[in-house]
A protein has these predicted regions:
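Conserved small/polar residues in nucleotide/adenosyl-binding loops
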Residues: 345-347
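Active-site neighborhood of glycoside hydrolase catalytic domains
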Residues: 331-342
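Active-site-proximal N-terminal segment of extracellular/periplasmic enzymes that hydrolyze or transfer
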Residues: 31-104
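Short, structured active-site-proximal loop/turn typified by the sulfatase FGly-forming signature C/S-X-P-X-R
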Residues: 87-120, 126-131, 193-197, 218-224
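Hydrophobic membrane-insertion alpha-helices, especially the h-region
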Residues: 7-20
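Formylglycine-dependent
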Residues: 139-195, 202-291, 297-306, 312
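Positively charged n-region of N-terminal signal peptides that target proteins for export
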Residues: 1-4
Length: 347
């Protein structure tokens, strides 16, 4: 009997030690399966944006339409207006540059927070996020421990810095977000008679009342996964970094969107272009009434994925990752150009 207990205990210890030794690989193998079970993604579902008055009616409302375009994780030097742009100035962003050249250029503008979600809260609310207690980007509860495991095995130079004391003191994931009592620009404009539409990333909380439609947007096409295209799509070129955090981003990525809180579905093209085309639909459908469009691009946040056609324009760059990164910026600039062109016709 003792010998049997000894063998069982030894086997369990061996299994535990193997699992611990290969915990990162096991996580990377299991997460996609669990995500697809918990969050199944349907094939593409067409959006149904609200429409304004018929084109044949004369527009008498002279209030300006407002389009707010937000890029994610773009560096200050990535556009050619600033010090020549990415890739030592060889990447040009003429459409983005034109906004500054023909309008206002805030050369000393700063974000109200150094992390993603709180800075977005400041844009929507017009307040410093510290004023309402939203100082850190929400991270799922279990991920706080998982991330600490991941970074332990990374190169010390590239390793993410994590303040465990702060991380462990944060509210639960479902409680984190911009408080529902905060008034957003969308709520103000909606109450003033504007049609309000959101496209892309939100990142301001998952609790009841924190979604875009509860915060002033009549329609919302929301980012629901971090992939720009499936990794094996023939039209996409991928670039990866040798860090466990990047591996986890790739592992946990889904190619998904959600319209007005409905089921998850696959976009029908490269996400930057998909959001752009949907923005053009909003403009076309609402050209005869005042509207506020918040086009919140996922680009150029990782994972690094660019269209092959864009990467092929970057062959003068020697670094593969830089080629892909630049291709993502080119797609973003193309998006801005399309919105500008259509807006000049209808606004």
């Amino acid at each position: 009997m003792l010998k049997k207990i000894f063998y069982i205990s030894g086997t369990l210890l061996l299994i535990v030690s193997i699992v611990w030794e290969y915990k990162v690989n096991i996580l990377i193998w299991t997460i996609p399966t669990l995500m697809n079970i918990a969050n199944p993604v349907q094939e593409n579902i067409p959006t149904n944006w609200s429409s304004g008055p018929s084109e044949i009616q004369k527009r008498t409302d002279e209030r300006p339409n407002i389009i707010l375009i937000l890029a994610d994780d773009m560096g200050y030097n990535d556009i050619s207006l600033h010090n020549g742009g990415a890739a030592d100035g060889s990447l040009k962003t003429p459409n983005i540059d034109s906004l500054a050249q023909s309008g206002a250029w805030f050369s000393r503008g700063y974000a109200a927070n150094a992390t993603c979600a709180p800075s977005r809260a400041s844009i929507m609310s017009g307040k410093y996020p510290t004023r309402f207690g939203y100082e850190f980007t929400p991270v799922p509860d279990a991920s706080r421990f998982i991330v600490s495991w991941l970074v332990e095995e990374d190169d010390p130079v590239l390793r993410a810095r994590i303040d465990s004391e702060v991380a462990n003191s944060l509210p639960s994931f479902m409680e984190m977000g911009m408080p529902t009592e905060q008034i957003t620009i969308a709520e103000v404009l909606r109450d003033a008679g504007y049609y309000t539409a959101h496209i892309g990333k939100w990142h301001l909380g998952h609790a009841y009342g924190m979604d875009p439609q509860s915060q002033g947007f009549e329609d919302s096409l929301t980012l629901a996964g971090s992939s720009y295209l499936p990794e094996n799509d023939p039209e996409v070129v991928n670039a990866k970094f040798d860090t466990n955090i990047d591996r986890m981003v790739w592992t946990s990525s889904q190619y998904a969107a959600r319209f007005n809180g409905g089921d998850l579905f696959k976009p029908d093209k490269y996400v930057t272009d998909y959001y752009t085309d949907e923005a053009l639909k909003v403009i076309e459908k609402n050209q005869n009434r005042p509207f506020f469009l918040y086009l919140s691009h996922w680009a150029i946040h990782n994972p690094l994925q660019a269209l092959r056609s864009d990467v092929e324009q970057m062959t003068h760059m020697s670094d593969h990752n830089l080629q892909v990164y630049s291709g993502m910026i080119a797609a973003l600039d193309r998006s801005v150009g399309k919105v500008i062109d259509l807006s000049l016709i209808h606004i």
